[in-house]
């Protein structure tokens, strides 16, 4: 694994932490349009941040030296999982946003918010696995 790839993984992990903290700090209220709209805006900001992190992740896959990293199966598998988690987060947000805007806030959407948070935490775990396996 190249030092550049490892440094990029470290940066992605560090940049993901405040996003997770922000999402975990958001209050879910199924009875308030204002609070639901605010929550959706905060999540939309997180989606944009995740897209930026995903672009950084993709740069590892696009790097010509990535072929050297393919020898490290655990590294590649964990990167794939992070990519999947980021994608699942973004896609699920789009679904949730359209449901809330069409139907209004509902109490059963709380599981959707929990799912979003869980995807980012799972991505962070895979990034941490890469970093602990290497160091």
Where are these regions (language model features)?
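Long, low-complexity or tandemly repetitive, helically biased scaffold regions used
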Residues: 4-135
């Amino acid at each position: 694994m190249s030092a550049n790839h490892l440094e990029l993984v470290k940066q992605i992990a560090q940049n993901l932490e405040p996003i997770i903290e922000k999402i975990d700090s958001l209050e879910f209220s199924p009875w308030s349009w204002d609070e639901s709209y605010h929550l959706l805006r905060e999540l939309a900001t997180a989606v944009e941040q995740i897209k930026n992190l995903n672009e950084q992740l993709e740069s590892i896959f696009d790097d010509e030296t990535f072929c050297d990293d393919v020898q490290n199966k655990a590294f590649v598998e964990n990167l794939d999982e992070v990519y999947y988690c980021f994608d699942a987060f973004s896609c699920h947000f789009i679904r949730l946003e359209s449901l809330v805007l069409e139907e209004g806030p509902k109490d059963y959407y709380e599981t959707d918010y929990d799912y979003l948070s869980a995807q980012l935490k799972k991505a962070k775990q895979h990034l941490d696995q890469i970093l602990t396996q290497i160091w």
